[in-house]
């Protein structure tokens, strides 16, 4: 390290009314196995907090006076706070950590080893982002880390490997000092900052086993709505975000490189997928709509098609918005693959999110399947017919309902995400294999992959997930529903209960296995039906709550029902419910 580099790492933490989480964040840095007091500096920048944040900051500074710098300033936003901390940096590598996120304890040592091997080749290294609290999975861009080895990504060769967040990055201090955060920008300011660093160098590193825990709060949706309730998000942010990066790419490369096009696709999907907001008048909204279209026009269609994060609904919507309407003449189906302008959109035989089966029942020796199909495929082929095939010989057409569900307001207009269908299939008593197929207007056929929703007793992964409907035994096998009347129903039930138990045990789900055993035992005793009712796991106050309250208030009408409302213990509605 040079004389200016007193530490290996400097961590800049902007603080604003963060008393609830700040200790977790700071403690995660102090706990680093590389050694905090010798190798790490923390710069706490209080951006005019009105809670106990300053008190906490001062306590940490008092405890670690050689490692912690405390700066107090008037409220000016997160970019202002980050910029204020930059002159105090004394580390070789810098992390801008949000005041409610935290690092795993071995991250800094892993990042240090990686940087020391690649110092002359990169300016920035990114780590994995794992959500916690209201959501517990990894960031949609986590596919970049599927390779187990740390590596350097050349952005001209791996256009899909975009980096959006600064909090999960470590940046060389000399690169940090070359740039500043735009203090007038309230959304995407960190993406602009790191994108200039990445595009300037043309590559960046990924440390595959270093994990940043990114807090996803249950009220994040309300924060997003708050952002969308401000005119600035519509009128100023697009130019500050997309316009700035396009200008930078043109100056650096003479073109809008495909890496940046993928970044535009990733962020613009949320704007194209979000329709009219009454914060704008009609004229302002039309201007905003044209602005979004202008920036989407910098994106080649193939970037939309090849995106690894867009759903098919997103791809069709963005292509339609960009071109004015979907050019159906450029759509084709080749070996179950949907093609658009000779680029592959999706393999219908592999992808499971197009056709869903929601309910299964048997009435009068007739199997009734009810489900839904995603409407993007109907927008591609309005004349499409859905049918279920039995034993490769007989076809039974599905009947679509007159109504769709999941209405979504978008820049292309109102969309209905799903269309319901029902199909009735006569049962013979002999073994029958049943699977769905679509037929296009030109006679082309494609076998569809089924997805069973939460109300279905079948499961594609668990071989023990089967059901009886009267005398009929029903299971899932080889992307088909298998129906038959077993010669010994009890023997069949026991065999598949054992399979279900072994599957759960193999996958270390003994908690679920025990519940399964209890459920089997309870069948031999008279009991009430247990109804589990819910809205979302973190929020109540919707149709589920109203149904639950109705049943509770009319218990005499439901004497054999024991209702329970399911909700997270961390939900703000938990105590009320």
Stretches found by the model and what they are:
Residues 278-281, 286-530, 553:
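Basic, ligand-binding patches in group-transfer machinery
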Residues 369, 406-411, 435-437, 520-521, ...:
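Active-site and donor-binding regions of nucleotide-sugar-utilizing enzymes
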Residues 76, 246, 552-556:
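Surface-exposed amphipathic alpha-helices with a cationic face
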Residues 214-218, 224-254, 270, 276-301:
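Catalytic core of nucleotide-sugar-dependent glycosyltransferases
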Residues 1-244, 264, 513:
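Nucleotide-sugar donor-binding/catalytic module of glycosyltransferases
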Residues 243, 255-278, 372-373, 434:
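P-loop NTPase catalytic cores that bind/hydrolyze ATP
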Residues 137-142, 392-399, 573:
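Surface-exposed loop/edge segments in extracytoplasmic proteins
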């Amino acid at each position: 390290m040079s004389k200016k580099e007193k530490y290996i790492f400097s961590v800049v933490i902007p603080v604003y009314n963060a008393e609830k989480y700040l200790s977790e964040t700071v403690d995660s840095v102090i706990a680093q196995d590389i050694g905090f007091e010798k190798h790490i500096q923390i710069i706490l920048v209080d951006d005019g907090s009105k809670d106990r944040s300053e008190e906490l900051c001062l306590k940490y500074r008092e405890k670690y006076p050689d490692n912690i710098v405390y700066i107090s300033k008037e409220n000016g936003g997160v970019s202002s706070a980050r910029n204020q901390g930059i002159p105090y940096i004394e580390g070789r590598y810098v992390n801008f950590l949000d005041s409610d996120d935290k690092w795993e304890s071995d991250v800094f040592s892993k990042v240090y080893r990686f940087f020391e091997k690649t110092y002359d080749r990169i300016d920035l290294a990114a780590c994995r982002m794992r959500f916690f609290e209201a959501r517990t999975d990894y960031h949609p861009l986590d596919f970049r880390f599927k390779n187990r080895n740390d590596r350097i990504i050349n952005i001209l060769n791996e256009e899909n490997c975009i980096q959006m967040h600064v909090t999960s990055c470590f940046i060389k201090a000399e690169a940090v000092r070359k740039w500043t955060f735009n203090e007038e920008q309230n959304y995407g300011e960190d993406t602009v900052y790191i994108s200039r660093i990445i595009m300037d160098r043309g590559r960046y590193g990924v440390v595959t086993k270093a994990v940043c825990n990114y807090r996803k709060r249950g009220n994040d949706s309300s924060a997003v709505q708050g952002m969308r309730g401000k005119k600035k998000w519509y009128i100023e942010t697009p130019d500050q975000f997309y316009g700035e990066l396009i200008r930078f790419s043109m100056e650096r490369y003479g073109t809008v490189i495909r890496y940046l096009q993928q970044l535009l696709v990733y962020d613009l999907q949320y704007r194209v997928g979000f329709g009219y907001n009454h914060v704008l008048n009609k004229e302002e909204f039309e201007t905003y709509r044209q602005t979004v279209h202008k920036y989407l026009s910098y994106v080649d269609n193939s970037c939309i098609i090849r995106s690894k994060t867009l759903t098919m609904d997103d791809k069709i919507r963005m292509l339609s918005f960009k071109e004015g309407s979907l050019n159906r003449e450029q759509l084709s189906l080749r070996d179950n693959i949907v093609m658009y302008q000779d680029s592959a959109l999706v393999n219908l035989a592999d992808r499971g999110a197009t056709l869903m089966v929601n309910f299964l029942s048997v009435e009068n020796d007739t199997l009734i399947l009810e489900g839904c199909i995603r409407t993007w495929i109907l927008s591609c082929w309005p004349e499409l017919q859905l049918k279920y095939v039995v034993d490769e010989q007989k076809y039974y057409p599905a009947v679509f309902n007159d109504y769709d569900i999941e209405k979504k307001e978008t820049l292309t207009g109102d969309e209905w995400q799903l269309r319901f269908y029902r199909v009735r299939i006569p049962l013979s008593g002999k073994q029958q294999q049943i699977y769905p197929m679509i037929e296009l207007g030109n006679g082309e056929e494609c076998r569809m992959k089924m997805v069973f929703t939460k109300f279905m007793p079948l499961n594609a992964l668990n071989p023990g997930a089967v059901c009886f409907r009267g005398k009929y035994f029903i299971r899932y096998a080889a992307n088909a529903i298998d129906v038959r009347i077993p010669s010994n129903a009890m023997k069949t039930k026991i065999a598949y209960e054992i399979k279900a138990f072994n599957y759960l045990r193999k996958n270390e789900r003994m908690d679920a296995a025990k519940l399964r055993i209890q459920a089997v035992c309870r069948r031999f005793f008279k009991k009430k039906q247990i109804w589990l009712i819910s809205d979302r796991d973190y929020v109540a106050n919707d149709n589920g709550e109203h149904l639950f309250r109705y049943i509770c208030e009319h218990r005499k009408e439901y004497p054999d029902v024991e209702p329970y409302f399911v909700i997270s213990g961390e939900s703000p509605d938990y105590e009320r419910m």
